[in-house]
Amino acid sequence: APLVRFAAIGHAYLAWASAHPTHFRVISERPLIDYESSDTLARSNAAIRDVMQQLLAEAFGEQRDARSQALARIAARALVYGLARMAVDGHFPEWGIAQQPTGQTLADTLDFFMGLLGADPGPMRAAGPAPTAPSRARRPR
């Protein structure tokens, strides 16, 4: 099933980040590794995005348009990246489930998200304008 394979990518990423926290920290700081100049990194990232896009297209077919599939891909990426960052930075003792190892919390959270992803794609927020991202420009003091 495509969503099972899609979830497997996320589970593998979380396992890798947990097993290699220093490597995760280095590659997640793109300015430190000059990401823009690395053809290998760009190709690798494009390849995994293409696989994720294909799996979502297989999973949803006509149920979700290309934009909805892109939003699902971004949400999944943000979730696994955020979970990996939280694990590597040691946030789970305060945010995790009591008496449960971090690895289990990571897996359970991703599985929870995948369950939501496979559910009705209707909007989850009230109608109205979408929130805007904060500006990165520095404000004068």
Task: Give residue spans per PLM region.
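Phosphate-coordinating loops and pocket residues in cytosolic domains that bind phosphorylated ligands
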Residues: 29
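Positions that flank functional sites
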Residues: 32
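Hydrophobic alpha-helical connector segments
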Residues: 1-23, 45-47, 66, 72-76
